[in-house]
Amino acid sequence: MKKLLYLFLFISFFGYSQTPITAANFLTAINICLSTNPVDGLCSDSEYGVMKDWDVSNVTNMFRAFEQRSEFNGDINSWDVSSVTNMVGMFQEAPMFNQDISNWDVSSVTNMSYMFSGAGAFNRDISSWDVSSVTDMSDMFYSAQAFNGDISAWDVSNVYSMDQMFYGALSFNQDIGDWDISRVSFMFMIFQYTGISVSNFDFTIIGWYNNATTIPTNIRFTGNVGFCQSGDLLYDLINKFGWEIPISGSSYSLQSFYPDCSTTGVDDQNQLDISIYPNPTNDKLFIQGLSDATKVSIYNVLGK
């Protein structure tokens, strides 16, 4: 009986001999693990074990955890990050990282500034993240050149800073008009040097204008992108809400295609081989004469 007990104790000790990950040793564990396995973190000989299997549930701060890890691209999707509040610069300048982290529970995170800044390869689906606690998203995707994820459903209603959020995100081209920007105070250069199209920028501005619980005032808003259908609303933001929006004339200015937009109204049907009826309408609108399958978007005079 004693031999069996000793054997059980030995097996128990051997099975749990790895050093637990704590808030105090988290960064040390990363440094030790990646010193031997810088690409995948499969440091089985480390006192902390293989990185993907770490229990990080007690870690609250992941500030710059993988900053400037030029080779790292390890699988950490199974991490329990539900206690983390700070992810500032977590993958900043980690140019190779492009792993699935869609399973992460980020509902406690309040700061994601610089999180993927300079993470040039990252382009994973993070659309399901609960970011409702986040207040700072400034520079979040700064120079994240590959990122073009659909994050249109994010709840950003508590965010106050989006300064340079997509600056240099050359591939980013999404309509994020469903965002409630009511609490935002900073948007300087949010779309500077992005890939956002005229139509997606228009949809974004139109959506923000119509969806905000309260339209924020005195926003400094710049970005060298083009606009068309959102022209009236942009001028409203300038004249009624005090937004500082330079239009044409510098590398930080919006480029106006307004009012010469490639949008067809009911008055154009005589120039085109189509019929649009009835006008006005309260319910249904018919467009007759389109020979090919065509995507049609319909707006009222406010862009809704």
Where are these regions (language model features)?
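Negatively charged
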Residues: 18-263
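Structured helix-beta-strand junction loops
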Residues: 7, 240-241, 272
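Sec-dependent N-terminal signal peptides
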Residues: 4-13
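Bacterial Sec-dependent N-terminal signal peptides
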Residues: 16-19, 268
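C-terminal outer-membrane/trafficking sorting elements
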Residues: 268-304
